[in-house]
Structures are given as C-alpha cells and as structure tokens.
C-alpha cells in the first residue's frame, strides 16, 4: 500500500510526524495522460473527492473524454482512510448508512453494502457513558440513559413548528421552493441561530440536558452557537426521519470494513477503465471560460482545455482560484463568508481494551465527545475524539499535549498514539464539511448550486439534502455529470464509451 503525504501521527517516543501513512487511495504514478497536448476534453473535473469521482465516473461511463485534476496525492478529498500498525483510521467521513440514497447506490454497485463493521462494541469492561457539564455533578450512566437525555433536549430544541419539523421541513431534499411550504416561511426560520433558539427553550432543560445539547450542536456544526444555523439542525432532524433515535444508526454506527478509501478507489478505477485521464499532485490556479472552450491552468503553469468544467473545490477554498469571467457578486459574497465548520477530529490508541465500550462527553473541553471505536491489533482501545472550532487556542499538530489533556479530561486514559488530519490548516480544505450561518441558505444556496457559463460547481458544501456528507457530495457530482452528458451527447451524438 502506498503512503500519503496527508495526516499526522503522534507517538510518545517520536512526537508528531506528518504524512508517511499507508492509504489505499494514493494514486501512483500520479499521472495518466495519453491525449495530445492540444486535446480538448469533453470535461475537466477539478478534485478527486466523492463529487469529482461521481462526476468523472458517470461521464466516462457515458462516453465522454474526461481529465481529472487533483491537488492531493490520493482520491477521496475530505474523506480517506489510513492504515497504521494494522488498524484502519477514518480521517474524514466515516460512517455509512442505508438511509442515504446516493451512498447506498454506490455501496451496492461495488458490493460494499453488506461489508460493514460496527463502531460500538458493548462487551468490554467500561460499558458506560460519562457526562460532565456545568451545573451538574459529573457522573457515569448507561448508554441508554445518555441517549434519553440527548433525545429529550434535542426534541425540544428542533420542534420549532410544534409538529416535530414535519410542517416546516416536509421534504428535506427540497428545503427551498417545495410544493408544501412557502419559501418565505423557511427563510424566516433560516434567520435564527442556534444561540437564539437555545435561549428560547433553555428554561425547559435540566443542566445536564442543556450541557449535552449545547455540546451536541457544536459537535454537529463545528462552529459556535452564534454562527451556527438553526435550520441546519431542522434539516438534519428531517433527514433522520424526524427522530433522534436515528442519531446512532445513521451517524455513528456502521463503517465500511475496508474503509472509505476502498469505495473511493473503486469509483476511480471504474472511471479509469472507462478512459479517464488524470493528474494528481496538481493544484490549479485559474479557470477561464471562453464560451466554446474552458481553459484550466495549474499552479505549475500547465494549461488544459475542455468543453465543460466541473469544479468540486470546497467552499472555503474557492477564494484561492481565479475565475474569468468573474463569478457573480452573490457567489463571491458567499465565498468570502464561507462556512463555519472548523471542527477537530483525533484518533487515540489508549492502553488496554477497557474503554472500547465507553462513550462520553465533557463541555466545555477541547474535545467535547469521545467514542470507543474498536480494538487495535495490539489490544488497545481505539477512541475517536471530536471538538468544535478551537483554532485560536488549539492546533493539534503543534499542541499534542493539549490533545492528550483533552482526552484525559473526558475520561482517565493513557494515550499511546494519536492519528489525525487537521482540516483547518489544510490548504485544500480550510475547514471541515460545510455547516452554515443563519440566512446563508436563503441568500446563497441557489447561486452556489448554479452553473457559471460552462463551469459547473459540485460539492457536498451546497448539496440539496445531505449537505456536509458523502451522500451530498455524490448527489452534486451526479447532477453535474447528468447535465453535461445531456448537453454534450446532444451536440455530438456520442453513444459509446471513449478510449484515448
């Protein structure tokens, strides 16, 4: 298995080291270009995350000539798997579910829908939950009781319409302009922050409920209570079939046994079999749309031409790319604002297996939640810790001792190793998956989803339904590919797969 330049590992004896982690998503050699230098592709896809993979696979499958350009050395974008000491660590997106239609379709296509493993194993010694929040005595409790506390607080928080969100968000894949709810009514709720809503209902909550709810909202958004949109929580509730009982089954239970990079690699290899050309470790700096052809220039000075371009560049990175003609003022404003998710995710190998069955939370803390997630080949518990935006005081690769302290504040433990990716200091992400500010959806979603001449924008960061998730990335890549296929096949009558 090849090694990626991404990610960090901390060990007691060596400290923090960057990269050099085995990853099945690494593409080596990094280039395959057999087309002539002056070739005009049907499409250039910028980015090899799930949006880009979906678009490239679908377009090559329908006979279009496609070039993929990717800044990283691997497929997967903000979702990838590394192997260290015989154990798989999910560095970005992790959990899968049959509830996500686009994702389930891909899992089925590559026969991964039943090749799953479970995150939580209840057979180990510390089979309990710990809670530590202001105004309440820290304590141990059962996982079931912790779930009940969380569910009650969440239900009070999201029930903004008195009908468990079913009135205001009946069609979560069509939140704006659906046939049941007036857009102006949705926009009214979209103006509300999580802080605003929390202040409305906090008198109904116990200290434990208030603390765990606050931490959960920040865990989800990766931002602050003030800059996190209430609507994003309403949307999430609707997507979970209007029940917090589905938090676990949908968001934190099932993983691909072979890892996310196995799925990403399968999509990539099928596209390659269909004739996909590609260049990895190839950042771009500009996109020039000349109507009949679009020119994409790399930071290394190479230029590629295509009839269409699919940009899957994350929202928080788009400001680094020059577009000609300029993007609309509305899109430029959205890009300047960006999204709020600057979360932290750190894997820890903890001495002994006892904490494998433990989950817990502490707020405030640099890592608010910890989840037991399997046993390493050496017999240690694998714990995953999550925190909100702490960029001003915490940079994990610079402050590993703060990370260890945060784990130990969640529960006494001896951390022997940490594995992580800092998406906030990563130039190709500049944050995690997109969670939005109040009013951002109302003002900018339509524009972010729209095309700009012959340039299509496809990213989970502005998906219709599962925004910020793998499913949303696949949705956006699929929709961009479908439109380009229709346009180009109509113009050129290409019925078969292309081979260079």
Language model feature labels by segment:
Residues 2-30, 293, 358-500:
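Conserved flavin/dinucleotide-binding core of flavoenzymes
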Residues 2-11, 15, 118-228:
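Mobile amphipathic helical/loop "lid" adjacent to a hydrophobic cofactor/ligand pocket
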Residues 38-68:
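N-terminal Rossmann-like FAD-binding beta1-loop-alpha1 element of flavoenzymes
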Residues 39-41, 299-308:
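Core beta-strand elements of the Rossmann-like FAD/NAD(P) dinucleotide-binding domain
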Residues 60-84:
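Glycine-rich FAD pyrophosphate-binding loop
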Residues 173-283, 312, 322:
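Active-site/ligand-binding neighborhood in enzyme catalytic cores
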Residues 280-295:
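A conserved short coil-to-beta-strand element within the FAD-binding core of flavoproteins
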Residues 309-330:
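Flavin (primarily FAD) binding-site architecture
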């Amino acid at each position: 298995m090849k090694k990626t330049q991404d990610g960090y590992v901390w060990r007691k004896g060596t400290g923090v080291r960057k990269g050099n982690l085995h990853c099945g998503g690494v593409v080596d050699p990094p280039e395959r270009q057999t087309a002539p230098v002056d070739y005009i592709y049907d499409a250039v896809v910028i980015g090899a995350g799930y949006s880009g993979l979906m678009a490239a696979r679908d377009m090559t499958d329908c006979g279009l000539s496609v070039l993929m350009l990717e800044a990283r050395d691997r497929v997967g974008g903000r979702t990838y798997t590394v192997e260290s000491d015989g154990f798989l660590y999910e560095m970005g997106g992790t959990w899968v579910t049959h509830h996500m239609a686009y994702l389930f379709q891909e899992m089925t296509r590559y026969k991964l829908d039943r090749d799953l493993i479970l995150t939580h194993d209840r057979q180990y010694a510390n089979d309990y939950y710990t809670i530590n929040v202001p105004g309440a005595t820290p304590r141990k409790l059962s996982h079931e009781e912790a779930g009940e506390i969380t569910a009650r607080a969440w239900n009070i928080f999201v029930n903004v319409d008195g009908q468990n969100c079913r009135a205001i968000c009946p069609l979560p894949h069509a939140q704006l302009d659906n046939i049941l709810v007036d857009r102006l009514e949705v926009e009214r709720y979209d103006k509300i922050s999580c802080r605003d809503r929390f202040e409305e209902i906090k008198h109904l909550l116990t200290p434990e409920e208030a603390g765990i709810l606050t931490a959960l909202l920040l865990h989800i958004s990766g931002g602050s209570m003030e800059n996190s949109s209430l609507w994003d929580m309403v949307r999430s509730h609707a997507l979970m079939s209007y029940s917090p009982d589905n938090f676990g089954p949908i968001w934190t239970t099932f993983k691909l046994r072979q890892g996310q990079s196995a799925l990403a690699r399968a999509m990539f290899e099928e596209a390659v079999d269909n004739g996909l050309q590609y260049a990895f470790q190839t950042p771009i700096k500009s996109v020039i749309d000349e109507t009949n052809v679009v020119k994409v220039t790399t930071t290394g000075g190479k230029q590629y031409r295509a009839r269409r371009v699919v940009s899957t560049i994350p929202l928080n990175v788009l400001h680094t790319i020059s577009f000609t003609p300029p993007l609309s003022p509305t899109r430029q404003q959205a890009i300047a604002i960006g999204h709020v998710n600057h979360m932290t995710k750190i894997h820890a190998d903890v001495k002994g297996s006892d904490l494998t069955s433990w989950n817990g939370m502490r707020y405030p803390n640099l890592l608010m939640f910890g989840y037991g997630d399997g046993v390493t080949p050496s017999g240690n518990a694998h714990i995953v810790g999550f925190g909100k935006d702490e960029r001003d005081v915490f940079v994990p690769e610079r402050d590993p001792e703060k990370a260890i302290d945060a784990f130990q504040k969640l529960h006494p433990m001896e951390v022997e190793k940490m594995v992580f990716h800092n998406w906030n200091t990563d130039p190709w992400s500049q944050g995690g998956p997109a969670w939005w500010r109040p009013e951002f959806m109302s003002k900018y979603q339509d524009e972010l989803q729209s095309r700009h001449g012959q340039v299509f924008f496809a990213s989970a960061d502005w998906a219709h339904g599962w925004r910020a998730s793998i499913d949303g990335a696949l949705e956006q890549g699929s929709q961009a590919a479908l439109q380009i296929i229709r346009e180009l096949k109509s113009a050129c009558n290409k019925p078969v797969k292309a081979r260079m």
